[in-house]
Amino acid sequence: FFFEDEKRYGDRRGFEIASLLAGDDQEGIFQNCTVWDILAGKTIAVKNLRNGEIFYISCDKLVVAAGAIPLLPVFANDDLPGVYTAAVVQKMMNRELTLLGKHVLTVGAGNIGYLTSYQLRQAGANVKAIIEALPAEGGFPVQADRVRRLGIPILTGKILLEAVPSPDGKRVSGAVIADADNFQPVPGTEKLLTGIDLINICAGLAPDNKLLRKGREIFGVDCYG
């Protein structure tokens, strides 16, 4: 990802790699479409998200590459406006040129936590801290050093307990964190962080394997993930 040989597209962005692999003849590549269901008889039901059309594709083998979905740790008031996953923060910042908050707490000291915190700082936000429940930092040291040089503290062994609502209850205004022992809060170590309007969740990813499970029911050993 960071150090691939150029022959393996290590010098290119993801959208550039997709264009290269698709080539000029894009027959058989269906954009703006999603797999609606996997049916008996090795048939894939596909829905066009733009016009609502549903069509069917029959095949002998199936490869599922559905990616992953963000993990959202459980904490009080996790549904408040101002609590977002890194994917949402990045999309709004990079594509919509919109900061979802100016005073940020990042949850998760891994490469994504470092990267989004760095980008947020470049965009003008104040990243107050990056917290990590594990006792040690994750990710590449070069990424951690990059945010540390910006003066962003990385606090290990800390867990998020609560997103504190604003007085009108309409958004985040702070957070309660505590020392962590095996992902459990240590009683009596709670600390209130004030002046936060964005909690940036970078707690990792889980495989999006629902289609893979369904595919293996229909295709058996001819379904790959």
Which residues make up each language-model segment?
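Residues forming the flavin
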Residues: 1-225
